[in-house]
Design a protein with these regions (language model features):
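An amphipathic alpha-helix adjacent to DNA-recognition modules
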Residues: 1-23, 38, 42, 82
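Short, structured helix-loop boundary elements
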Residues: 4, 8, 12, 34-38, ...
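Amphipathic alpha-helical packing segments from all-alpha helical-bundle domains
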Residues: 13-23, 68-94, 104-108, 116
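Hydrophobic alpha-helical connector segments
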Residues: 24-53, 106-110, 150
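Short alpha-helical functional segments enriched in proximate histidine and acidic residues
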Residues: 47, 88, 144
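Hydrophobic/aromatic-rich alpha-helical bundle segments in the mid-to-C-terminal region
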Residues: 55-60, 71, 93-140, 148-152
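Short helix-capping/turn signature of helix-turn-helix
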Residues: 60-66
Length: 152
C-alpha cells in the first residue's frame, strides 16, 4: 500500500511528465498550430491509455495533492507550464497563425473533450480503444480553436 506522500509524488511526477511531453509537441511543431492542437489531443488520450493506473491515480488524487504538502511544487510546475503555453499562443498569434486567444479558452477546447472521453474510458463505459477517438476529437479541437474570439 502506498503512503499519501508516495501517492502525491507519483501524481506530481505524472503531471510533470504530461507537461514535458506537451512542451515537446509545442517545440516539434513550432510553426504548425493545427498539428500542435491535434497532437495534444492524441497525447492526452495515449498518455491515459498507456498507463491506466497512473491516469486513475492522477484523476482521483490531483486536487488533494494540490492542497497538500506538495501543492507548491505542483503549483510551480503548473506556473512554468502555463507560461510556456501562453508564450506559444502569443508566438502563434504574432505570426498570424491563430488569433490571440485566451489561454483558458484554448486549454478548455483542446483538453476538456479529451479529458471527458478519457474519464468515460477509465470508467469502462467505452468499448473502443481510447486512441481511436484521437482523430475526431483532434479535428473538433482545431475547429474550436479557430472559432475562438480574439482576446480583447
Amino acid at each position: 500500500m502506498s503512503t499519501d506522500s508516495e501517492i502525491a509524488e507519483q501524481v506530481v511526477s505524472a503531471l510533470e511528465d504530461h507537461q514535458r511531453r506537451t512542451v515537446e509537441i509545442l517545440e516539434e511543431n513550432e510553426s504548425d498550430p493545427e498539428a500542435v492542437v491535434k497532437t495534444l489531443v492524441r497525447l492526452h488520450l495515449e498518455w491515459t491509455e498507456e498507463d491506466r493506473d497512473r491516469a486513475i491515480l492522477v484523476s482521483r488524487n490531483r486536487n488533494e495533492v494540490a492542497a497538500g504538502p506538495l501543492g507548491e511544487k505542483l503549483a510551480a510546475s503548473n506556473r512554468e507550464f502555463f507560461s510556456r503555453m501562453k508564450a506559444w499562443i502569443d508566438s502563434q498569434a504574432e505570426a498570424g497563425r491563430i488569433e490571440p486567444v485566451s489561454f483558458n479558452l484554448l486549454h478548455a477546447v483542446v483538453f476538456a473533450p479529451a479529458q471527458e472521453i478519457s474519464k468515460l474510458w477509465l470508467a469502462g463505459r467505452l468499448k473502443r480503444p481510447l486512441g481511436s477517438y484521437a482523430d475526431p476529437l483532434g479535428e473538433a479541437a482545431w475547429a474550436s480553436v479557430c472559432a475562438l474570439p480574439a482576446r480583447g
